[in-house]
Curated annotation (Swiss-Prot):
One of its GO terms (biological process) is methylation. In the N-terminal section; belongs to the methyltransferase superfamily. tRNA (mnm(5)s(2)U34)-methyltransferase family. It catalyses: 5-aminomethyl-2-thiouridine(34) in tRNA + S-adenosyl-L-methionine = 5-methylaminomethyl-2-thiouridine(34) in tRNA + S-adenosyl-L-homocysteine + H(+). Catalyzes the last two steps in the biosynthesis of 5-methylaminomethyl-2-thiouridine (mnm(5)s(2)U) at the wobble position (U34) in tRNA. Catalyzes the FAD-dependent demodification of cmnm(5)s(2)U34 to nm(5)s(2)U34, followed by the transfer of a methyl group from S-adenosyl-L-methionine to nm(5)s(2)U34, to form mnm(5)s(2)U34. GO terms for molecular function: flavin adenine dinucleotide binding; oxidoreductase activity, acting on the CH-NH group of donors; tRNA (5-methylaminomethyl-2-thiouridylate)(34)-methyltransferase activity. Its main location: cytoplasm. This is tRNA 5-methylaminomethyl-2-thiouridine biosynthesis bifunctional protein MnmC. Keywords: Cytoplasm, FAD, Flavoprotein, Methyltransferase, Multifunctional enzyme, Oxidoreductase, S-adenosyl-L-methionine, Transferase, tRNA processing. It comes from the Bacteria. Pfam families: DAO, Methyltransf_30. It comes from Leptospira interrogans serogroup Icterohaemorrhagiae serovar Lai (strain 56601).
Length: 647
């Protein structure tokens, strides 16, 4: 709850403290945090590939972030900026807008920021601004748990919670000591407070500290730098999925597979200045990614779990990304209504909203007999409504991603890989041409493990299976043309786009026939006729039948991360060495430098690909990733073998 001092300076009622100096909050930010971390000088001399990464404890009104954004503009053509902030009690858009209204210098930046500051979820929220030059990760939650969820190292730290006497939880000894897990040699920090307990905790963590003149009425402030050359590992990261940082600068990457995973990854990497070779024997999005339309919404579970946590994060980033990337011809936020089904029963859906602490801005429960915008045929349908559920045309998105400068498409089959010093060679079968790159990423759907297996005596370490799906397009009827939202139950129906609906999709693990089958068309028609009889669909409405073979993992989450040797894994983590005692020390899993996989997206290819590509790009470059380490663990390629060995 906010009050206002002189109707200008925001004050927290909970902590009885101001958010920034009433004298000049913007100049205070520059003095304490920008100059306190020597950012102008460091930015002038920043000549490495990686983003400059800042961690802030206490987002508040966003003043520090927006001021940093403004000061960074002079350097935007030289490097990227990644700003990570933690906030337990986030302000809403109206409060932030009013709080920052006194700073005329920030008007345009504030406007751009607030246009994306929506659909927030507990935990990590990831944004991009300035055409991908600024990455922003906002963690909503407790600071002590948030610090253990950051996977990666930062270059500077802003400590800006309310005063230690007002908000002791943020300045707790354990919180400050955990800063070593996100620090590396040369990481700097600054803060407005010089309290003894703060200095002692930071010194104990490995920071060399120095007092400096404070801002305004504050006599002193504190600066520091991390002096330990040893990189402390996050104790929450398990040995088999610890981060492996690149040993060399990454300049060239070869991506095998030009579906939605490969093309979105090519886009993410090329925007980071990396030359990308995109290789596929068929062309851009010519296999399963070539479906005419895909729909997206988060997957709600009764209690938060790996699938719901990942899909919520992926959904909100996909919305943010597509809103600036796509045009109305291949992306539209129509809203999505999901009816109660046997699998998605009312308790699961309602408890899912409650237990994930989701606002009505994202999803709400619609009880029976409530009015709804899609007309009378839905008035007796209970379910949930995702306000920003959307449809896309995957092939159009894939092609636009592949047109990004720095992406070279090569039509051909990758037939052999071999290591060449610190690089990798990849042979193109048709031309005999060899591509040399610092890294290779395999994004080729259910063929993802075939080339990799040649390195491991024929063993494919990734359990990906084919799952057949068939969809049909339907000519609109007079009644169906009035549908404004995507309708979901056991299957889904899109609104009419240019006179045509998409009705999908079947799910068959046993029949892998690549051709459309009448029995599946009949099954889909039977569903829509029984579920929405007043729409008057019949077999004469069928226009197109399309089949795709999804690449599905056993846990229905993507496989995303570094390649490892399964033989070495079993040697290290033998069954007899996996005790119940979690405190026993194990060696970290050694991954194969320069080889990565990104696949197994299943029926959530569009939903997973945008955030998945950003995670992959961060892993390849050794930067902080835009999801929690606990979420990242459930995407790691070694997770299936680990579970198997544990048995």
């Amino acid at each position: 709850m906010l009050t206002w001092k002189n109707n200008l300076t925001p004050v927290s009622e909970q902590f009885d403290d101001i958010y920034f100096s009433p004298e000049n909050g913007l100049e205070e930010t520059k003095h304490v945090f920008i100059k306190g971390n020597d950012l102008y000088n460091r930015w002038r001399n920043w000549n490495i590939q990686n983003a400059f990464c800042i961690l802030e404890l206490g987002f508040g009104t966003g003043l520090n972030f927006l001021t940093t954004w403004k000061e960074y503009l002079e350097y935007k053509d030289r490097f990227r900026l990644h700003f990570i902030s933690i906030e337990k009690f986030p302000l809403n858009r109206e409060e932030i807008s009013k709080a920052l209204s006194i700073f005329s210098e920030l008007v345009e930046i504030k406007k751009e920021f607030l246009s994306s500051y929506q659909d927030l979820i507990p935990g990590m929220n990831y944004f991009q601004f300035l055409g991908g030059k600024i990455h922003f990760s906002l963690f909503l939650g407790d600071v002590s748990s948030a610090l253990c969820e950051i996977s990666g190292k930062v270059d500077a730290i802003f400590l800006d919670g309310f005063a230690p006497s007002k908000n002791p939880e943020m300045w707790d000894k354990s919180v400050l000591e955990n800063l070593k897990y996100v620090s590396k040699k040369g990481t700097t920090l600054s803060t407005f407070t010089v309290a003894r307990m703060v200095r002692d905790s930071l010194s104990f963590s490995g920071f060399k500290l120095e007092k400096r003149p404070g801002f305004g009425r504050k006599r002193e402030m504190l600066i520091g730098s991390y002096s330990d050359s040893f990189l402390e590992s996050n104790p929450k990261e398990k040995p088999w999925c610890k981060r492996a940082y690149p040993e060399l600068q990454i300049k060239t990457v070869a991506i095998v597979g030009a579906g939605i995973a490969g093309t979105t990854l090519a886009y993410s990497l090329s925007r980071r200045g990396i030359q990308v070779f995109l290789i596929d024997p068929s062309g851009i999005a010519k296999e399963t990614s070539g479906i005419p339309m895909a729909i997206s919404h988060p997957h709600l579970t009764k209690i938060p779990g790996p699938i719901s946590l990942f899909t919520l994060r992926a959904f909100r980033y996909a919305l943010s990304f597509l809103s600036s990337f796509a045009d109305q011809n291949f992306f539209e936020k129509t809203g999505l209504f999901h009816s109660v089904t046997q699998e998605m029963d009312s308790e699961r859906l309602q408890k899912g909203i409650e237990n994930h602490k989701l606002s009505e801005e994202i999803v709400f429960w619609k009880p029976i007999a409530s009015k709804f915008q899609n007309g009378d045929f839905l008035e007796n349908e209970p379910g949930v409504f995702f306000r920003n559920g959307f449809w896309t045309r995957p092939e159009s998105i894939a092609k636009k991603c592949a047109e990004q400068p720095g992406v070279e498409f090569i039509k051909g089959t990758a037939s052999r890989i071999e290591q060449d010093g610190t690089s990798w060679k990849l042979l193109i079968q048709e031309s005999g041409h060899e591509i040399v790159a610092n890294s290779i990423i395999f994004c080729n759907s259910h063929s993802i493990g075939k080339l990799i297996a040649s390195l491991f005596e024929g063993e494919e370490p990734f359990p990906i299976r084919k799952v057949r799906g068939q969809l049909i397009s339907l000519k609109e009827t007079e009644k169906s043309s009035r549908i404004s939202n995507i309708l979901c139950a056991e299957h889904y129906l899109t609104p009419s786009i240019l006179g045509e609906h998409i009705l999908g999709s079947t799910f068959d693990e046993f029949d892998l026939n690549p051709l459309p089958q009448k029995k599946d068309t009949d099954r889909l028609l039977e569903f829509v006729q029984n579920k929405y009889p007043s729409l008057n669909f019949d077999s004469s409405c069928v226009l197109i039948e399309k089949v795709g073979l999804r690449a599905q993992t056993p846990d229905r989450l993507p496989i995303l991360g570094p390649v490892f040797d399964p033989r070495e894994f079993r040697k290290i983590y033998k069954e007899i060495d996996l005790p119940k005692n979690r405190n026993k020390k194990f060696p970290n899993l050694k991954t194969i430098q320069g080889l990565y996989v990104f696949g197994g997206l299943g029926s959530r290819g569009i939903l997973s690909s945008f955030l998945g590509s950003e995670i992959m790009a961060s892993l390849i470059l050794g930067e902080p990733v835009p999801v929690e380490s606990s979420v990242l663990e459930h995407l790691h390629p070694a997770r299936f073998l680990y579970r198997k060995v544990r048995k």
